[in-house]
């Protein structure tokens, strides 16, 4: 979609591509297509993380986290990969009935959340899929605690996305 707006980018007002209301879809990218492509591109990363996930969830149950938060969950492929890895290859996977895994997919983009939710439902994976901003972890922690009674610190926090579509914000409360 962005290349269809090349005249605005080169000769007009490039800010037009970002001027949308909160309820409108982005006009510079087809986010559903972007989410689909990102999910496939991350498969190599998934393989590397698998060993890490297995080692964490093979520990004695009292040492294991309550679950995992995937920040920038995209299409939900990473949550699906993590769940299947834990279920099939770890001590925790044998204990899911008594020690359920709290899975959270968080994303800044509503289209990504919709795709994640649909993919996880289609794969019969229970997870909370919520809006979250990596630039505001305090709000994410507050939302998790208030809405689900879970502390952010009790989850393994993982992300697979590139920092994109983010406007620079100056740090606040610098010491």
Predicted regions span which residues?
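Conserved Class I S-adenosyl-L-methionine-dependent methyltransferase catalytic core
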Residues: 1-67
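Phosphate-coordination loops involved in phosphoryl transfer and adenosine-cofactor binding
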Residues: 65, 100, 154
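Conserved beta-strand/loop positions that form the S-adenosyl-L-methionine
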Residues: 71
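Conserved SAM-binding loop of SAM-dependent methyltransferases across substrates and taxa
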Residues: 75-96
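The conserved SAM/SAH-binding core of class I Rossmann-like methyltransferase domains
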Residues: 104-106
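Conserved SAM/SAH-binding beta-strand->alpha-helix loop
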Residues: 109-110
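S-adenosyl-L-methionine
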Residues: 114-151
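A short SAM/SAH-binding and catalytic strip from SAM-dependent methyltransferases
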Residues: 135-137, 144-174
């Amino acid at each position: 979609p962005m290349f269809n707006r090349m005249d605005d980018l080169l000769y007009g007002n490039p800010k037009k591509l970002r001027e949308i209301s909160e309820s409108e879809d982005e006009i510079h990218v087809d986010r559903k297509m972007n989410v689909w492509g990102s999910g496939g591109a991350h498969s190599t990363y998934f393989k590397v993380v698998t060993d890490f996930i297995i080692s964490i969830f093979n520990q004695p149950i009292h040492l294991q986290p309550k679950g995992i938060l995937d920040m920038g969950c995209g299409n939900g492929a990473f949550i699906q990969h993590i769940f299947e890895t834990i279920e099939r290859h770890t001590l925790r996977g044998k204990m899911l009935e008594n020690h359920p895994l709290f899975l959270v997919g968080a994303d800044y983009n509503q289209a990504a959340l919709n795709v994640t939710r649909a993919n996880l439902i289609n794969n019969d994976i229970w997870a909370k899929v919520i809006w979250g901003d990596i630039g505001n972890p305090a709000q994410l922690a507050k939302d998790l605690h208030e809405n689900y009674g879970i502390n952010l610190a009790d989850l393994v926090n993982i992300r697979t996305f590139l920092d994109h579509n983010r406007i620079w914000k100056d740090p606040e409360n610098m010491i």
